[in-house]
Swiss-Prot record:
Protein name (record): Olfactory receptor 2G3
Topological domain ranges for the Extracellular compartment: 1-25, 80-100, 159-195, 260-272
Keyword Glycoprotein recorded: yes
GO molecular function per UniProt: G protein-coupled receptor activity; olfactory receptor activity
Protein family per UniProt: Belongs to the G-protein coupled receptor 1 family.
Keyword Transmembrane helix: yes
Membrane topology category: Multi-pass membrane protein
Organism in which the protein naturally occurs: Homo sapiens
Length: 309
């Protein structure tokens, strides 16, 4: 009997951080703080990018897509997490778990590809500036964004469907604060080798290949930056690139730790804390890092706050 058949009438018990009751109040503030920052920062980027014509460029098109992703991704996880951190009985309905699994997987996978698209955009802007407008035309940008969203959806359908077919044999105590594939695999009472193989293959496609391509792009960008004669301009470019790469490393690195570790060596308690980084922290960092040193965005924000936009 599959997970779907036997679990439809029973909630999942999310053990979450119940082993650390004193820490739950701190985690509640942590999650709430980062969730609110994510909403404010990313909504601001979407609004400004839409209202200010000078920002109607490929860079801000992708950044707006990333902001929308981050809002939806954290919203699929944070509210349920906040509720469970506040109540003694930490549960989620079977339907809620299925919805959370499909949505978070789709959005997370989409972001993995979209970050690679953004690195490609930066590579062409820096290394091929004379051809940038021709190459990064609106049609190509829309195609790249569409591929990101559709590939994320496909990944979710494969990942989640394979996982939800597993029999649980009455075990509904999920040792996590969200419904996530590695934690659900541990509930299965049958051999999960095939599922782990699917998890590995899909994870390589989404969390190993994209950061490798991003690294190559930034390698070429670094070479181009080194040819800049102005020390100040070179320092500014390196500072911006290092900030972008920091977010990329945190996002992909934490996902790789959770999804590509062998199941027998996976420390679930440690994994839960690491999951907080790519579910709560990086969606907050993205708008800060990608716009902090951007004069156009800061000028547009100033016009918005002064009512001139």
């Amino acid at each position: 009997m599959g997970l779907g058949n036997e679990s439809s009438l029973m909630d999942f018990i999310l053990l979450g951080f119940s082993d650390h009751p004193r820490l739950e109040a701190v985690l509640f503030v942590f999650v709430l703080f980062f969730y609110l920052l994510t909403l404010v920062g990313n909504f601001t980027i979407i609004i400004i990018s839409y209202l200010d014509p000078p920002l109607h460029t490929p860079m801000y098109f992708f950044l707006s897509n990333l902001s929308l992703l981050d809002i939806c991704f954290t919203t699929s996880l944070a509210p349920q997490t906040l509720v469970n951190l506040q109540r003694p009985k930490k549960t989620i309905t079977y339907g809620g778990c299925v919805a959370q699994l499909y949505i978070s997987l789709a959005l997370g996978s989409t972001e993995c590809i979209l970050l690679a698209d953004m690195a490609l955009d930066r590579y062409i802007a820096v290394c091929k500036p004379l051809h940038y407008v021709v190459i990064m035309n609106p049609r190509l940008c829309q195609q790249l964004a569409s591929i990101s969203w559709l590939s994320g959806l496909a990944s979710s359908l494969i990942h989640a469907t394979f996982t939800l077919q597993l029999p649980l044999c009455g075990n509904h105590r999920l040792d996590h604060f969200i419904c996530e594939v590695p934690a659900l695999l541990k509930l299965a009472c049958v051999d999960t080798t095939v599922n782990e193989l699917v998890l590995f293959v899909v994870s390589v496609l989404f969390v190993v290949i994209p950061p490798a391509l991003i690294s190559i792009s930034y390698g070429f960008i670094t070479q181009a930056v080194l040819r800049i004669k102005s020390v100040e301009a070179r320092h500014k470019a390196f500072s911006t690139c290092s900030s972008h790469l920091t977010v990329v490393i945190i996002f992909y690195g934490t996902i790789i730790y959770v999804y590509l570790q062998p199941s027998d060596s996976y420390a679930q308690d440690q994994g839960k804390f690491i999951s907080l980084f790519y579910t709560m922290v990086t969606p907050t960092l993205n708008p800060i890092i990608y716009t902090l040193r951007n004069k156009d965005m800061k000028e547009a924000l100033r016009k918005l706050l002064s009512g001139k936009l």
